[in-house]
Amino acid sequence: MSRVAKNPVKLPSGVEVKLVGQQLSVKGAKGTLELIIHSSVEIVEEAGELRFAARNGDQQTRAMAGTTRALVNNMVQGVSQGFERKLQLVGVGYKAQAKGTVLNLALGFSHPVDYELPNGITAETPSQTDILIRGIDKQLVGQVAAEIRDFRRPEPYKGKGVRYADEVVRRKEAKKK
């Protein structure tokens, strides 16, 4: 059984939470995020904390309470600190350049790849082979990073491709005669 929902979510200073019906709104220094809460989950705000409880004790409801707690915790962290994901380009001639809401990638194809960034996401290129994806929505930051990585995944023989900065690519040995 998950015990995630038993831990309260602490609200840092500057973060405001508003619950209207089943709509939860979290507002902070970096922006506002909204979430529709499942009807089987009950949320109580007390003393700068949010507490989560299942309305009845069955397994699915308890699981939903834990999931809701994790999502709200990510929202609170996002509007106060934000999230970032770092990508690296490994390969000869692989380059990235951020131009406003478009990320221009040269990944060894016969054409450049232009990736349109969704609202709420910013991309920085500190160097030609590093990409920093930033935003307040953890799911969206991870989704954008995964979509960029999917253009050219790291291959196991030379390790060329787009990889997460903390990713370890398993290498294979070349075929021997």
From Swiss-Prot:
Coiled coil spans: none
InterPro entries: Ribosomal_uL6-like, Ribosomal_uL6-like_a/b-dom_sf, Ribosomal_uL6_a/b-dom, Ribosomal_uL6_bac-type, Ribosomal_uL6_CS
Keywords noted in UniProt: Ribonucleoprotein, Ribosomal protein, RNA-binding, rRNA-binding
Membrane-spanning residues: none
Recorded GO MF terms: rRNA binding; structural constituent of ribosome
PROSITE patterns in UniProt: RIBOSOMAL_L6_1 (PS00525)
Gene Ontology BP annotations: cytoplasmic translation
A GO cellular component entry from the record: cytosolic large ribosomal subunit
Record-stated family: Belongs to the universal ribosomal protein uL6 family.
Assembly description: Part of the 50S ribosomal subunit.
Functional description taken from the UniProt entry: This protein binds to the 23S rRNA, and is important in its secondary structure. It is located near the subunit interface in the base of the L7/L12 stalk, and near the tRNA binding site of the peptidyltransferase center.
Record-given protein name: Large ribosomal subunit protein uL6
Organism of derivation: Pseudomonas syringae pv. tomato (strain ATCC BAA-871 / DC3000)
Organismal lineage: Bacteria, Pseudomonadati, Pseudomonadota, Gammaproteobacteria, Pseudomonadales
Gene: rplF
